Amino acid sequence: MKSRLIRLATALTAAFALTPALAQEKVLNLYSARHYQTDEALYSNFTRQTGIKINRIEGKEDELVERIRNEGANSPADVFITVDASRLAQADALGLFAPVKSTVLEERIPAHLRDPENNWFAFSTRARVIIYNKMKLKSADVANYEDLAKPALKGKLCSRSGAHPYNVSLGAALIQHWGEAKTEEWARGVVANFARAPKGGDTDQIKAVAAGECDVAVSNTYYLVRLLRSGKAEDRSMMEKVGVVWPNQSSFGTHINISGGGMLKTAPNKDAAVKFLEYLASDEAQAYFANGNNEWPAVPTVRQPMRRKFVRHGMTRCVSGVGLFSRSR
């Protein structure tokens, strides 16, 4: 009897000793610069499918990167998600990401939408298009990014700061196509055409174009869709005054950027991190991830209304600016 009690006590001790390890395997610590309502369903579905609980910290990109760096080897973060290839490249250049070996991710995410060493992956895409006031310009006047620097547009162009990652990424893509000298000349021409000093975000540029404060600007596509889908009649009415051009259809195509993420080098839950990244590449998650910010799925086989809508409206050729950042580490 005594020996049976000893064996039982030993078994119970071993079982309780395993509990912390098992609990750790069922947790994912996510640092995310995304904050959309649809993400709640995205995360809860992952937990329901895998049993892995997500602990999420949201914040601005720069703040999260700085936090990860300050936490160092003791950081609890497993996955970092952000927007824009330049921000992913910056985190990678700081040595924050670890390569992920995953057949699922390599098969689902196109090569041009992931880091060559699989340090990070795109999970949605957006285009940086030209917008113009329909009463003042024709689409042919601004058919290409080059047109934004032409003297004919002097005093007619609005822009957010050139130092913003969205514009930095566009500039990097143009360097990839034109080279540094031509891109610098183009940038000087763009500055010479400013109707006012750069200010605000993309939505502010759309409003300025619609109001006639300037004739032309550039914007990420999801800002346009937000206004088109707005519950405010004045937003939808404003969009009737704005035309959209998918630039450079006769050459290299419209600049495409991404939202994405990767597994952190110091991740304490690496298996959970890989499972989560693979989940983000699933058909179900791709729809949630893209629709949350009116973007397109990174997985080309995923059907999505936004993709079909814009193809009907003239998007025939697009190019990603991701490659330049991947090679610049």
What do the PLM-derived regions correspond to, one by one?
Residues Y31-R34, A98-E106, P116-E117, W120-F121, Y132-K134, A140, E146-A149, A233-H255, ...:
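Short beta-strand->loop
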Residues S75-F80, A98-Y132, E146, K156-S159:
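A structural signal for short loop-to-beta-strand junctions that line the ligand-binding cleft
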